[in-house]
Amino acid sequence: MKTIERTEYLNRIKNLKDTPDIKVITGIRRSGKSILMQEYIQYLKDNFNDINVIFIDFMDLSFEHLKEYHALHAYVEKRYVEGKSNYLFIDEVQMCPNFELAVNSLYSKRKYDIYITGSNAFLLSADLATLFTGRYIEIHVYPFSFKEYCNYYDNNHDIEKLFEDYTIKGGLAGSYAYNTEKDRKDYIKEVYETIVTRDLVQKYSLPDTQVLQRLSEFLMDNISNLTSPSRISNMLSEKNISTNHVTIGKYIKYLCNAFVFYDIKRYDIRGKKYLESTEKFYLSDIGIRYAVLGTRNMDYGRVYENMVCLELLRSGYDVYVGKLYQKEIDFVAQRGSEKIYIQVSDNITEEETFKREYAPLLQIKDAYPKIIIAKTGHPKYSYEGIEILDIRDWLLNKNQTI
């Protein structure tokens, strides 16, 4: 299968070389964590002398004997080379029970630069502080962005065609190897079902998957809608699915921990405080929705909103849903001292639709940038101080358009 260098992620790892931290590569299943690790190993071998690379891949039967943490520890120590910079890479580390005991011991010796990846359900962001006694840095890997998708296909189609395809295929690049739509959908659906019906069931000892699956499908079908565990519980109960808001709240957390969804909380712009009552959920990859639900209730405005949310997260922004009086701002994106207010729409050619998007932004009185992202087909232009951007241009050139 063809691969492309994921420069942004690779540069981030390069910048962390030889820092005194455990580097933990996380992300949804099949997002490219293992390939990224291999690319970094090759970079080290190509550019540095006097290095010693110790690589363990627990998906490879050659390392089956190391699935016991004492054996793992002894194997690494035996391969340490005095006088060289020693780099330790462990792929699918969760396949060694109690792996953290070996990793923590090796880290404490201060003689290895350690990098690990693991299955999304067993190496959760929420668990890292508990697992590792030393410092760690998380490198979170997302599925392909639209820009990476275009690079993969060498931009040999017009942008309009590439964009239409991306809204269906999404960014799980393993699916690109298949020539038919059915095979691509089956691949993505298998990735999704492995997480929901195997990884999460095993991780949390869930008695059955019906509630979890119906919850996940509900969230997919309601991307960009504010919701809460109580609302979802009531809806499922009406469909004769026995559950309660406590269970739904836990299951939502599990799905987010495994990076199937990202939860986006509300922010009161006027009161400058975060609101807890309801939130929105966005899929980690838009291709999952099409693979699981097909075109049912397909709303491109919501699809575009999901794409914009993911792009903001990829770029390191903290993302919130804005509330201003009774109005809603799709996204308030913050990164350090930066802040951007963003509205997303599929089509703003109708005056009424355009007004619905810009009116809330005009009520915000601070000087931070305010933008509307839509499928305009036009170069960037301004209205009352608001920048209007074509979604394809923004996804490809966001650093130039913000």
Segments from the language model and where they lie:
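Hydrophobic anchor at the beta1->P-loop junction of P-loop NTPases
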Residues: I25
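Hydrophobic positions on the alpha1 helix immediately C-terminal to the Walker A/P-loop
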Residues: L36, Y40
